[in-house]
UniProtKB/Swiss-Prot annotation:
Residues 17-86 form the KH type-2 domain. The keyword RNA-binding applies. The lineage of its organism: Archaea, Methanobacteriati, Methanobacteriota, Thermococci, Thermococcales. One of its GO terms (molecular function) is structural constituent of ribosome. The gene is rps3. Belongs to the universal ribosomal protein uS3 family. Disulfide bonds: none annotated. Part of the 30S ribosomal subunit. This is Small ribosomal subunit protein uS3. Signal peptide: none annotated. It comes from Thermococcus gammatolerans (strain DSM 15229 / JCM 11827 / EJ3).
Amino acid sequence: MAIERYFIKEGVKEMLIDEYLEKELRRAGYGGIDIKKTPLGTKVIIFAASPGYVIGRGGRRIRELTRILERQFGLENPQIEVEEIKNPYLNAKVQAVRLAQALERGIHFRRAAYSAIRAIMRNGARGVEIRLSGKLTGERAKSVRFYQGYLAKVGNPAETLVSKGYAQALLKLGVIGVKVAIMPPDARLPDEIEVKEIVEEEVSGNEAQ
């Protein structure tokens, strides 16, 4: 049980760090983190479309982030590395954050989702799925799914080949959850069914989970 509690605690900590960095580094095209324990401390890889923004002038921002990760989140001797995302349109986290920003700017959810899908597919993705959940048009919360192309949904391919990202948009009606899944150009699987047009459908309560 002690080991289980440790991994749960570490998982929660990584989630909280991810949420914090998403807010702080939105302008950098934040695309997620990878945290690894090392003999010298904790290695933290930050994926971003604009590494220069993460580093800051004279390294000021990255030093401040290092201090916060150590003092606020309890990471032991954090060593931050920044890895550039070569194509932000194929990183699901970046796209989820950008879509959330579009919703916060007042762009209609349908227009924002369609625009994101077209941009992602133009950049070579084999498939993409977007799920928006919350009070999108009124007082009743609902979940809407948009998708195009081919996307592995179950099994090992879904875990290893599909880029997944989540973000939240804070609107007057409440919080909108934004989930994005992207199948990259180099993913190849047998027995594929491809959807050539963008499809939109409202998802029932159970399916939306």
